[in-house]
A protein has these predicted regions:
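Active-site mouth loops of central-metabolism enzymes
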Residues: 2-15, 74-83, 119, 186-199, ...
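Acidic (Asp/Glu)-rich catalytic clusters
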Residues: 25-26, 59-67, 93-99, 234-240, ...
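Hydrophobic faces of well-ordered beta-strands that scaffold small-molecule active sites
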Residues: 32-34, 69-75, 98-104, 190-195, ...
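An alpha-helical appendage that flanks or caps ligand/catalytic pockets
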Residues: 124-187, 220-223, 231-356, 387-391
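N-terminal beta1-alpha1-beta2 module of alpha/beta enzyme domains
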Residues: 1-65, 187-190, 300, 304
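Conserved, mostly hydrophobic/aromatic
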Residues: 28, 62, 92, 102, ...
Length: 391
């Protein structure tokens, strides 16, 4: 879900729907975003399964029950063919009356590659294929002229075929020759998002994306990523404002931080001991699972050295110095890849305001602890605070 400084291109008529309770979030969220992982995860043995259903199919079901909210699905450019992706997303766009978006990503996971009977390609090859995929998919989407779809029952003419141009593209990795037999939706074609980092990902975002699904833990990192995406758009001959950067936020809303921590402990406590070595690596300490319900000793706090290669490490040490047990440090979300503010609605609003006013993002995508509860609280209690502050 997201709010933004300006609506994304193609989402110029924001289709924002109610997230949890019918009507509670109408016109408050620009889109719902589904990630994807096309492989079996060993974590399913002890944790709730996630990302097991095809996101396009899932969002098609959601489209039937909603009217305004945008529907953004993740699909890989590595293990799909352009015609299939163009057809699937154009169908979702038509079914939803112009609310579809494609988060175009490359895939480097060996388990996912094995499912498709392939090996993991080198990064330049993966992104070379991604560029070709996006060019072909967008060409297929754009093959219909806006006035090609006649729908004239009286004359019996439904399509002006002279205004449907065939695609004839041949690249090093993919190709397509022919027509996509699906007319434009109300928004024309699906919106393209990007979630890749580094120079390869920036090039994709600059040339093709209207939105970037960001992954930054600090304001400084987010601001740098946002500026890099804007510069990439300009280098591709586009306006910098054509690309919107959405910072991720894994929030927990409650009466206070203790209330949220208790809830997280109830849901996730069994999985935390296995993550203790990772926390130790971030702090330069050897941490054993039998000490998970103890805080760091004064000597350990003095010896701790946050990893200079991990921006989350400083936050982890900051939380540990507050006297929390190691289990509680972990449920603060210090090893998550996005900021994890917890506490009262005012605390969450403060975080959003600080990032937004610092120029770290154009909007946010939110992943709450408990969707049924936190989305309603966010809409009913956090958003009014932001409105009062003129945000």
């Amino acid at each position: 879900m997201a709010s933004s400084r300006r609506p994304c291109r193609q989402l110029h008529q924001p289709r924002c729907g109610g997230p949890a309770r019918p009507g509670s979030g109408a016109r408050k969220f620009a889109f719902v975003f589904l990630p994807d992982f096309p492989a079996f995860s060993e974590r399913m043995a002890t944790e709730q399964p996630q990302m097991t259903l095809d996101p396009v199919v899932t969002l098609t079901a959601i489209a039937r029950e909603t009217e305004r909210i945008g529907l953004v699905a993740t699909s890989s450019t590595t293990f799909n063919e352009p015609y299939n992706l163009a057809r699937q997303f154009k169908a979702l766009d038509v079914v939803s009356h112009g609310r579809a978006g494609w988060n175009a990503v490359t895939t480097s996971d060996p388990a996912a590659a094995a499912n498709y009977g392939q090996a993991v390609a080198e990064r330049p090859e993966r992104y070379g294929r991604a560029h070709e995929m996006l060019q072909v998919v967008e060409a297929l989407w754009g093959s219909w002229g806006q006035d090609a779809w006649l729908k004239d029952k009286a004359s019996g003419r439904f399509v002006d075929v002279s205004k449907v141009q065939p695609v004839n593209l041949q690249g090093q990795h993919v190709a397509s020759r022919g027509h996509l037999p699906i007319p434009p939706s109300e928004q024309g074609q699906p919106v393209v998002f990007s979630a890749g980092g580094g120079q390869y990902g920036l090039t994709i975002a600059g040339r093709h994306a209207s939105g970037v699904i960001g992954a930054a833990f600090t304001i400084e990192d987010a601001r740098a990523q946002r500026e890099a995406a804007r510069e990439a758009a300009q280098e591709a001959g586009r306006d910098a404002d054509d690309v919107k950067y959405f910072a991720g936020l894994m929030l927990g809303v409650g009466e206070d931080a203790r209330d949220v921590l208790n809830r997280r402990l109830a849901y996730a406590s069994d999985h935390l001991p296995s993550r203790l070595p990772y926390l130790g690596g971030m702090l330069g300490l050897e941490l054993r699972s039998e000490r998970i319900d103890e805080p760091l000793t004064p000597q350990e706090l003095a010896d701790a050295r946050p990893s200079p290669f991990d921006p989350r490490s400083e936050r982890a040490l900051e939380v540990a110095r507050e006297g929390w047990t190691l289990r509680e440090v972990l449920v603060h979300g210090v090893i998550d890849y996005h900021p994890t503010p917890i506490g009262s609605p005012e605390t969450i609003a403060d975080h959003l305001q600080e990032w937004f006013e610092a120029g770290a993002c154009d909007g946010f995508w939110l992943s709450p602890d408990v969707h049924d509860q936190d989305i309603d609280v966010f809409v009913d209690e956090v958003l009014p605070i932001l409105r009062e502050r003129g945000l």
